[in-house]
Swiss-Prot record:
Keywords, alphabetical: Electron transport, Membrane, Mitochondrion, Mitochondrion inner membrane, NAD, Respiratory chain, Translocase, Transmembrane, Transmembrane helix, Transport, Ubiquinone
Annotated membrane topology: Multi-pass membrane protein
Assigned protein family: Belongs to the complex I subunit 5 family.
Principal place of residence: mitochondrion
Stated role: Core subunit of the mitochondrial membrane respiratory chain NADH dehydrogenase (Complex I) that is believed to belong to the minimal assembly required for catalysis. Complex I functions in the transfer of electrons from NADH to the respiratory chain. The immediate electron acceptor for the enzyme is believed to be ubiquinone.
Localization per record: Mitochondrion inner membrane
Enzyme Commission numbers on file: 7.1.1.2
Name of the protein this chain belongs to: NADH-ubiquinone oxidoreductase chain 5
Disulfide bond annotation, renumbered to this chain: none
GO BP, sorted A to Z: ATP synthesis coupled electron transport; electron transport coupled proton transport
Lineage, highest ranks first: Eukaryota, Metazoa, Ecdysozoa, Arthropoda, Chelicerata
Length: 552
């Protein structure tokens, strides 16, 4: 079943790739329209938009999904519910395509809610209390974004149209609704706690849902509303949120020991870079980084799943060092992914990250924002250095195994994604990135970019010594996402207590004035009236007998 759907998704992805080249080269787009109903002067229409951006994103989603299903054929082979898992993944892909191809706010809610529902089902796929708690945190955080989209639909009625292309100006409330919806789906502060918690899902779900498709839906929504960032208020707000998220996720990734959570925090960091690029009004550059990041991050998750699967569930990086002696191909692919994450020359993220840094230093005049950006970039280097150090030099192997016990079948989709990363990053950089852009930087700023790598190495050695000499130091504030997890849990528990109290009040009111109350009142009045009637009959009968005695 997995292989059949893999081949079908690859076929559809090739169609979207052809559409991308055709729409991009000829600079055209296609809109398919179907009128569902019309009420008074308002028409409800079903749209499908095929332009170069939607076709490229759809191609990426389908290609990654096909590799994940191919990978799941081996990864989920012993699971009893693998058929249900396959159908849930396909429903998720359908919801993602609806979100990408719909230029209509009213139809956007179909894909948006479909993503939230299917991601919740996939997070709780492994039935345990941890999965249930993670799923509840995920769906509650995403419900905030759903409410924002519904309010967007209400406000769109003022424009007498639901089409995104017909909206040329944005009011303050409309813009805030769009930004908050994007922040919830892309897990930016203060909605960041759900993304690491969602790592309770199977690793193929993390590779597809929580690295390359679901979390990028918020960024894609903001890319579609790129006119929003002509307003300085929205740009400044999004820039500050993204900078804080970048620093927070980098700190947590450096102090984390769980392999999947480290990759999840790096996803959070890269999403904040995409948001930062959008705040600078660099739409094509943000979209390019979104595509490249989706490829290499899904590949990193599949590498992590390969390691975890063959080590019987162990995912602590302190016990994974010698494993890569048994699988040098996976180590090579993982190193390419991490080099791309750091912006190593001519690999993946290099083409976008270097340009993003230069544009940021060119356009930003705020010293605090520049320092925050540098700190975030430094932590990106640091947690990658630490991951290299623990996987290759420092750690020990938790479970020794023979080379024959390693499942080779999962190597093929990982290798395909690696080749796809190397080809796509070069090709997309030629097509999307600006050819002639004058970037004027001072001599100090140029040297700052060059000295980041040796400075990060020096900071890495200092922090390693710091952790070594203080092994029992409680870094709760840094390791719990600045207490966002506890804050989210507290709000959820407080809401539950409030709802419980309100439900008790509701039951009390229902008891008094609802159906039960009406029933009790009717019974009381009936019994009272029957008592009165019985008394009247008794008195009348007694008087009749008394009169008969007197007369006769």
């Amino acid at each position: 079943m997995f292989i059949n759907w893999t081949m079908m998704l690859i076929s559809f992805s090739i169609v979207f790739l052809y559409m991308f080249f055709m729409t991009f080269y000829f600079n055209i787009f296609f809109i398919f329209e179907y009128n569902l109903m019309s009420i008074l002067s308002f028409e409800y229409k079903f749209y499908i938009l095929l332009d170069w951006m939607s076709c490229m994103f759809s191609f990426t989603v389908l290609m990654i999904s096909s590799m994940v299903l191919w990978y799941s054929h081996s990864y989920m082979s012993s699971d009893k519910n693998k058929t249900s898992f396959c159908w849930m993944v396909l429903m998720f892909i359908l919801s993602m395509l609806l979100l990408v191809l719909m230029p209509n706010v009213f139809m956007l809610i179909l894909g948006w809610d479909g993503l939230g529902l299917t991601s919740y089902c996939l997070v709780i796929f492994y039935q345990s209390s941890n999965s249930y708690n993670s799923g509840m945190m995920t769906i509650i955080s995403n419900r905030v974004g759903d409410v924002m989209v519904i309010m967007m639909i209400i406000f769109a009625i003022n424009f007498n149209s639901f089409e995104l292309t017909s909206i040329k100006s944005f009011e303050l409330i409309w813009g805030l609704l769009i930004i908050i919806a994007g922040l919830t789906k892309s897990a930016q502060i203060p909605f960041s706690a759900w993304l690491p918690a969602a790592m309770a899902a199977p690793t193929p779900v993390s590779a597809l849902v929580h690295s390359s498709t679901l979390v990028t839906a918020g960024v894609y929504l903001l890319i579609r509303f790129d006119l929003l960032f002509n307003n300085n208020i929205f740009s400044a707000f999004l820039m500050k949120i993204s900078l804080m998220t970048m620093i927070m996720s980098g700190m947590n990734a450096f102090f984390e020991n769980d392999l999947k959570k480290i990759i999840a925090f790096s996803t959070l960091s890269q999403l904040s870079i995409m948001m930062l690029t959008l705040s600078l009004s660099l739409t094509n550059l943000s979209f390019f980084h979104l595509i490249v990041h989706a490829i290499f991050k899904s590949m990193l998750f599949l590498c992590a799943g390969f390691v975890i699967h063959n080590l019987m569930g162990n995912q602590d990086i302190r016990f994974l060092s010698d494993f890569f002696k048994f699988s040098p191909l996976i180590l090579s692919c993982m190193m390419i992914g991490m080099f791309s994450l750091m912006g190593f020359p001519f690999i993946g993220g290099f083409y976008s990250k270097d340009v993003i840094m230069e544009f940021f230093f060119l356009k930003s005049n705020n010293m605090i924002e520049m320092n925050m950006f540098i700190v975030g970039i430094i932590f990106t280097f640091l947690y990658n250095f630490r991951l290299f150090y623990m996987l290759l030099l420092k750690g020990t192997l938790f479970n020794m195994m023979s080379k024959d016990s390693i499942n080779i079948f999962m190597n093929y989709p990982i290798f395909n994604l690696t080749v796809y990363l190397l080809i796509t990053s070069n090709l997309m950089s030629w097509l999307l990135l600006p050819e002639y852009t004058m970037i004027f930087l001072s001599f100090t700023q140029k040297l700052m970019l060059l000295f980041l790598v040796p400075f990060c190495t020096f900071m890495f050695m200092i922090l390693l010594k710091f952790i070594k000499f203080f092994p029992y130091l409680k870094l709760n504030f840094l390791m719990t996402m600045w207490n966002l997890s506890e804050l989210t849990s507290f709000i959820m528990l407080s809401n539950n207590k409030f709802l419980l109290k309100m439900s008790i009040n509701d039951w009390t009111w229902l008891e008094m004035y609802g159906p039960l109350g009406i029933k009790s009142k009717i019974e009381h009045n009936y019994n009272f009236s029957m008592t009165k009637e019985i008394n009247v009959i008794t008195i009348a009968f007694s008087l009749t007998i008394l009169m008969m005695i007197i007369v006769y």
